[in-house]
C-alpha cells in the first residue's frame, strides 16, 4: 500500500483508467458469449443471433465518430463514466424474464452496449495521451501497447468467463452479477478520476471530428469498411 501511495498522480490515474478498461472489456467479452450461447439454447437461428449484434456494431461506429468530440467537450472522465453506466443499464435490460427478450429488445440493449464500449475504449486510449508528458513518446507507446494488447487477451478471457457464468449461474444471474461488479467499478471511478481529465480548454466544433488532413480522412473511411467487413465475416 505504501508503494501504491508513493506513485505520482498521473500513474494513479493511469491505473484507474486501465482498471476501468479491463473490467469493462471482461464484461463485454462475457456478454457476447452469453448472448450467443443463451439465444442458441432458446432456439434462435444463426441469422437471428447475428442480427442481435447489428446495432452493437452500428452504434459503436457512430460513437467512435463523435467520441473524441464528446471527450473534448465533456472531459474524458465523464465519457468513461458514462460508458460504464450505460453498460450497467444494458446488462440490467437483459436481466429480465425470457419472454421479454425479443430480437428488437435485445438489439436495443446491444446498441447501448456498443455505445458504452466505444465511449470506454476512446476514453481509455485518449486519457493515456493526456497523462503522458510532452516529449515522452516512448512512454506513451508503451502504455498504449499495454492497454491495446491487454484488450484482445481480456476479451478472450471474457468469452470463457461468459460460458462459465452461464454454466454456474443462469443467464439472468450472470447479467446481475456483471452489472453489480461493474457498478462498483463505476462508483470508484466517479471518486478517483480527475474531473478535468482530457477536457479541452477551448470548446471544439462538431466539424472538428474530421481531420484537416485528407489522407487521414481517407484512412478513417478505409478503416470503417475494413472493420465492417470483419464484423460481417465474424
Question: Where on the chain are the PLM-derived regions?
Answer:
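Helix-to-loop junctions at the C-terminal end of transmembrane segments
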Residues: 63-76, 166
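Symmetry-related core transmembrane helices of the 12-TM Major Facilitator Superfamily/SLC fold
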Residues: 173-191
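Residue-level signature of mid-helix packing/kink "hotspots" within the transmembrane helices
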Residues: 57-65, 155-156
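Helix-loop boundary and gating motifs at the non-cytosolic
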Residues: 6-58, 217-234
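Juxtamembrane intracellular "pre-TM" segments in multi-pass secondary transporters
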Residues: 1-11, 191-229
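Cytoplasmic helix-loop-helix junction between adjacent transmembrane helices
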Residues: 109-151
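C-terminal ends and interior cores of transmembrane alpha-helices
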Residues: 85-100
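Hydrophobic core of transmembrane alpha-helices in multi-pass small-molecule transporters
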Residues: 22, 90, 102-120
Amino acid at each position: 500500500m505504501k508503494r501504491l501511495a508513493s506513485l505520482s498522480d498521473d500513474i494513479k490515474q493511469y491505473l484507474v483508467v486501465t482498471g476501468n478498461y479491463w473490467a469493462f472489456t471482461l464484461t463485454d467479452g462475457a456478454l457476447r458469449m452469453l448472448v450467443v450461447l443463451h439465444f442458441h439454447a432458446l432456439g434462435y437461428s444463426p441469422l437471428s443471433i447475428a442480427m442481435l449484434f447489428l446495432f452493437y456494431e452500428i452504434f459503436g461506429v457512430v460513437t467512435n465518430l463523435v467520441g473524441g468530440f464528446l471527450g473534448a467537450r465533456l472531459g474524458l472522465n465523464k465519457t468513461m463514466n458514462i460508458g460504464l453506466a450505460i453498460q450497467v443499464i444494458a446488462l440490467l435490460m437483459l436481466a429480465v424474464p425470457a419472454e421479454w427478450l425479443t430480437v428488437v429488445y435485445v438489439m436495443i440493449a446491444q446498441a447501448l452496449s456498443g455505445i458504452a464500449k466505444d465511449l470506454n475504449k476512446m476514453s481509455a486510449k485518449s486519457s493515456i495521451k493526456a497523462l503522458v508528458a510532452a516529449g515522452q513518446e516512448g512512454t506513451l507507446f508503451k502504455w498504449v501497447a499495454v492497454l491495446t494488447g491487454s484488450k484482445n487477451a481480456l476479451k478472450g478471457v471474457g468469452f470463457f468467463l461468459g460460458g462459465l457464468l452461464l454454466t454456474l449461474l443462469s443467464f439472468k444471474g450472470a447479467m446481475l452479477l456483471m452489472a453489480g461488479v461493474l457498478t462498483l467499478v463505476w462508483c470508484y471511478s466517479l471518486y478517483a478520476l480527475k474531473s478535468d481529465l482530457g477536457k479541452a480548454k477551448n470548446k471544439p466544433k462538431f466539424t472538428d471530428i474530421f481531420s484537416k488532413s485528407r489522407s487521414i480522412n481517407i484512412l478513417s473511411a478505409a478503416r470503417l469498411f475494413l472493420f465492417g467487413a470483419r464484423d460481417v465475416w465474424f
